[in-house]
Structures are given as C-alpha cells and as structure tokens.
Amino acid sequence: MKTESSGTEPEGASRSVGIVETKYMTIAEPPQALKLESGESIGPVTLAYETYGALDPDRSNAILVLHALSGDAHAAGYHQEAEAPGWWDAMIGPGKPFDTDRYFVICSNVIGGCKGSTGPSSTNPWTAKPYALEFPFVTIADMVSAQRHLIDVMGIDRLLCVAGGSMGGMQALQWVASYPERVRSAIPIATALKHSPQQIAFNEVSRQSIMADPAWRNGNYYGIGQPERGLAVARMIGHITFMSDQSMEEKFSRRLKKERFSFNFDANFEVEGYLHYRGANFVKRFDANSYLYITKAMDYFDLSGGRLINDRKVDTRFLVISFKSDWLYPAYQSQEIVRQLKQKQVDATYCELKSTYGHDAFLVELEGQTTLIHHFLEKTYRGERNGNGYRR
Amino acid sequence: MDIVANGIRPDHQLIFNMVEPGARVLDLGCGTGDLLHFLEANKDARVQGIELDERAIYECVRKGLSVCQNDIESGLAEYPDGSFDYVILNQSLQEIRKVYFILREALRVGSRVIVGFPNFAYVKARMALFFGGKAPMTPSLPYHWYDTPNVRFLSISDFQEFCIEKGFAVEKASFLCGQKRITLWPNLRAMGAIFLLSWREGQKGWSDDRFSHRWRSRR
C-alpha cells in the first residue's frame, strides 16, 4: 500500500537563486548544420542559456523552461548589477514551484531571437555581416530541435518537465509532439495548438507596423538604427492584448497624466503614457527583425488535428492551465489541448484559473499556478524516482 | 456526510468495495478527490477526475491526482469508447438534467457505472412531507427548497424502474442509512443508494445516438 507523503509547501520559505550568468553553447558547427522545417539549414547556431540548481547523478531531475515571444534565457535570479530578476523568478528558485533545491532548471533563448541565441541580428559567418532577412525562417519545431541539441550535449535523456506560457507553451507542446519519449511531463500555460485568425491578425498588424517604418529598410538597418517607431507600436499592440478590460480599468481607468486635457496629441491619459513607456523601453532591448521572425513562427505553429499526440505511445503527463480573463489565448484553446489529450488517453490535469490580469496572468497570477505546478511536479518526480511510471 | 472510524465516508467505502483492483476509474464530480485517492492508494487503480470547482482541483492535485476542469454534462464527450473500467457518478445524479444521456455516455466511455444518490423516499422525508406538509430535509437531502442544487428528486424504486426501462443491468446495489447498511425495505429505510450498472445484454442504447455519432466522426 502506498501512502501519500505530504510535500513541503513552497509558500513562505522561497528564496532567490541569487546571482546568475548567461552561458553560451554552439551547436551545428560545420560540416554539421541545423536542418530547418522550411527545408533550409543553418549553422553554426549559438544558444544562450542559463541553468539553476544541480543535475542529479542520474540526470533525471532536469526541467526545461520555455520563454514567450519577447523573453530570454534569463528566467530566474539576478544578473550582476541588475535590479530586475529573470522573467519567471517568482516560480523558479529554492522553495518555489520549480524548486532548485530539487530540480535542475534550464532556460534557453530561442533561435531567431536576439538575446544571445543566433537570430537575424547575428553575424552571418559566410558574409561577416548581420543575417537580416537572409536569416532562414524558423518555426516552433526548429526552436525545439535546437533545444534538443542543448539537452543532448548536457547528457539528459529525458526531461522531467517542459513548461512555459504563451509561445513557451507552444514549445512545450512541440516538445511532446517531436520527442514524446524524452519528456516525462509538460505544463503548457495560456497557450494554443494553433493561432486563431484573431491572433494572426494582431501579429500581422505588429509586423506591418515594423515594416511600414522607413527605418526598417527591408531589414537592413544594422549599424544604422532599428525601426524604433514601428517596433514600439508593435509592442504597444502587444501590451493591449496582454491585458484585460478589467485590468486596464483597474490600472489606469481614465486617469490623466496632468490635471487637464492638453488639446493636442500628446499622451494625456495614463494608459497612453504606459503604452509609450512600454514601447520606448522595448526598442532598447529587442530586435525588430527578431519580432518579425518569431511572430511568424507562432502563426505557423499548428498541432491541431491529432498532431500533438502522434501514434507512438505517449506517457507524458500534462498540466494545462488557462486564465479566465485571457482573451488573447482564451480558455477554449487550452480546452482543445485537453480534448486532444483525452481522445488519446493521455494523463491530463486542466484548470482554468480565476484572474483578472488577462494574458499577463501567466507571469503575475501566482497563487494557483504555484500550488498546481508544485504538486504536479512533485508527483511526477516521485513517480519517476520510484520507477512506477504511469501505466497506460 | 458522516465519516467512519477508518476515515472514509460510508458511501465511498461501498463504491470502493465495488471496484476491482487495478481498474481504470473516472470520477465525475470528484470533489477534493478523497475517493480517487483512496482507490489509487489501496486498489492500485488508475484514476482520473472531472471537477468544476477550482479550489477542489487544487486539493486533488495536492493529492497527486489528475483532474480536468469540466462540468459533468460535457466532460465525457472526448473520451474514446471503453476508456475506463468504471465511471463513478456519486451524489451528483440528482443535480443533472440530462440523466439518461449522462448514464449512456458514462457507459460508452466505461464498462460499468457506479451511481450514488440520495433517496427521496426515505422514511423521514416521507414523514416531513406527509405529516409536516413541508419539502423534506434529511442528512442526505440537507438543502432548503430554495437553495438546493438538486433538480431531480428520485427514490430507490424510481431508479430501479428507470434501469429496467432503459436497459441498464443492476449488477450490485447497496443501501445506506448513515453508516448502517440497509438490506430490508431500502426504499423506506435507506437515505442513500449505490448502484453498479452495466448495459443489459444486447442493449447498448447509445449506438443510435446523435452525440456519439458526432464523437465518432470526429475521430
């Protein structure tokens, strides 16, 4: 008879992983190359990544955390001299759901990105100039295949978990579709099997905004200055879609920056100021061409129609999470994932969490996610350790 | 509901007794997952829950259970035929509008269905109605008329008749009054009942059903 060991609650005693550093690994060096879904190939490919915690001697406690559109490898802890922690610091660290006292957590920047991994702003070794639009189109499957090389080099046969929100969730799903035998569990959060026309439309407006900026110059702006206005507008659109009507009301209402209207087109409302601020900040840290490539990769992504779970026996456990006020990735899209899992009799847990934060909830709505992820991982970990995997 | 000395609800104990070791079990409306957890731990069952309440789902996941958030009426549609050995529908039958549809669906995805419900014809309920002239309130029907989630008010005899009419075979039936098993005159003396159902030979009433057609064409 089994008895349930009551796990320690993550709340209360959680700490930061402290000072961390981004590392780099180069794969697909000539004569090798990374074969891409489009038929093209690319190499060498550099991947920026960070790790937190220690890998077990039997390498069974590795968790791959996957970032969203504008994220990077810096998921937790602090960079030297930096004020802000990594993008998922609330969830990764000692005593946190991704407990680095127990698990080895890896996060890598996607290919096509601009945060240290090879992307359109990287130097093309054949021309010694930035790739710009010479950069081949990459898909979510390509991002995942690059990550698989990283995991291979680390000597990890099977990941305890792949987890991420939004585009990170797409990558988690793609991991199961591409390499089901290499993932023990998956946590796709606020994500979808495919973009709806509405989601594609928002991305297309963002892309058009970048490409309509004369400073874009067909992508050849490196060394001159990137299309900041276009990229800023693209990001503003993004931020509108990340919030809910209610969260915007709570955050800004119709409050003014100054006491009265200026009767010109300056930012009068706080919400305008916020969007401007977000846009202006974003152009300092993100490459416009990367934005084009990555949004396209998200639009191309499609694991609907039974492609998530192929005919191989899949014993990956799933924890699927959506948020009530998320209208960019509505709950019905997560429910569609769950439907696929039920049809293929894959072990699944699904919960739609109450939140008013919209799509942003996956980064800020912590309570429910903390409880669910902590216990889900604990069960997965125990199952793996006891060698009594889930029979099908 | 009372809890007996070994920490398990008497209705859960009866359901537990009906389940074969190592079975695949789906609990519709599994609440905080006590029954599933007990089955997993002590019958080596492969269990899955469906539950609507977010807080209850947290409790299930805390116990290491897999649960999908869904209402009972739409939670079964995606499961292929014969996904489970048992589908449990305990203490929620009386809250369901499409009773026959759910039971048929449950017998599509599972080989057997275990149904537990409160008995509306329990003697104290009859007395409340007959002598008091008031809508009955009993330990198994604890709600006022104005806040009850129940939409179906059935007795054990009603359900037995329903099973005969719809082609369900009653493999087992157990009756409870508090912690006590009732064998004599259950429709009068029992507060609740647990039925183990399967299709009567040659019935499988769902084959002509438009819902399962929809499901099958999707596969």
Outline where the language-model segments fall.
Chain B
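Conserved alpha-helix/loop element of class I SAM-dependent methyltransferases that forms part
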Residues: 6-22
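S-adenosyl-L-methionine-dependent methyltransferase catalytic module, highlighting the catalytic core
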Residues: 100-108, 112-211, 215
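A short SAM/SAH-binding and catalytic strip from SAM-dependent methyltransferases
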Residues: 86-97
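Glycine-rich SAM-binding Motif I of class I
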Residues: 33-37
